[in-house]
Amino acid sequence: MTRLTLALDVMGGDFGPSVTVPAALQALNSNSQLTLLLVGNPDTITPLLAKADFEQRSRLQIIPAQSVIASDARPSHAIRNSRGTSMRIALELVKEGRAEACVSAGNTGALMGLAKLMLKPIQGIERPALVTVLPHQQKGKTVVLDLGANVDCDSTMLAQFAIMGSVLAEEVVGISNPRVALLNIGEEETKGLDSIREAAELLKSAPSINYIGYLEANELLTGKTDVLVCDGFTGNVTLKTMEGVVRMFLSLLKSQGEGKKTAWWLILLKRWLQKSLTRRFSHLNPDQYNGACLLGLRGTVIKSHGAANQRAFTVAIEQAVQAVQRQVPQRIAARLESVLAKSD
């Protein structure tokens, strides 16, 4: 494995350095070839590195940043006033070639705008999309996009997302001739917004896309499609609803029957069932797949959940490592060139 360097916006997210710095140390423990540039306030970061050993410190560098973009800041205002912020500096490190990817749990709109401004979209792509790969009940994976980068999407953008998602599924996930579906309120062709119906027509006529039609939200984890496409508003709401239900389910499995007087053998049986079911469904835990790639850029940018805990942010760092190792932007660009040529 070759050495690689990532830039972390350690000030972003709901918990900032208290989560991101320990996560960085955890990532270093897991990958001996990893070097991390911690972008943020040195006075805040340095005390959190007290437990880092010499070997870890040799693969860490603090890059000072004057300020942080607030999570509730309007993207347009944040971008105009972004100079000196941890998010912008982390992206600049990627642009300058000092880092191979950026990871941030900060303001999604600002990250999208700054990344597009500084790293530029791949030729043929109008706007990048946030994408993640979710596990489904058939023990396979489904590529889902957009998850919040673009609240409003026209039919052309949805079709471009479908192409990018299809290429990602084939080139990175390893799915041959991936099935592509549009998220909609019904499977009938007359259902949904104009943009969705128009995107469906575009995808039907695209020879390189294996378009299978509409899919409803309750079938997200069924494995009926390999790529699911939607606008950022719908995708974000769908993903967070699913995550909330999964967290509640896993929590109920662990707490079921607590505090009640029950025969000893029933207690043992319940504990066995709880452990068994928790193991069976643990792959659905949102912490296991935190980190959405901002797909369609000339560089690698990973967006972590703002509310990510230490384990979840570590997973986001691991996602960045995998994206760099698999050369996602380069492979997407190469495939898009041929795909878009065939679609013309």
UniProtKB/Swiss-Prot annotation:
It catalyses: a fatty acyl-[ACP] + phosphate = an acyl phosphate + holo-[ACP]. The keyword Nucleotide-binding does not apply. InterPro entries: FA_synthesis (IPR003664), Phospholipid_synth_PlsX-like (IPR012281). The gene is plsX. Belongs to the PlsX family. GO terms for cellular component: cytoplasm. The keyword Disulfide bond does not apply. HAMAP family: PlsX. One of its GO terms (biological process) is fatty acid biosynthetic process. GO terms for molecular function: phosphate:acyl-[acyl carrier protein] acyltransferase activity. Its EC number is 2.3.1.274. Pathway: Lipid metabolism; phospholipid metabolism. This is Phosphate acyltransferase. Signal peptide: none annotated. Catalyzes the reversible formation of acyl-phosphate (acyl-PO(4)) from acyl-[acyl-carrier-protein] (acyl-ACP). This enzyme utilizes acyl-ACP as fatty acyl donor, but not acyl-CoA. Homodimer. Probably interacts with PlsY. It comes from the Bacteria. It is an enzyme of class 2 (transferase).
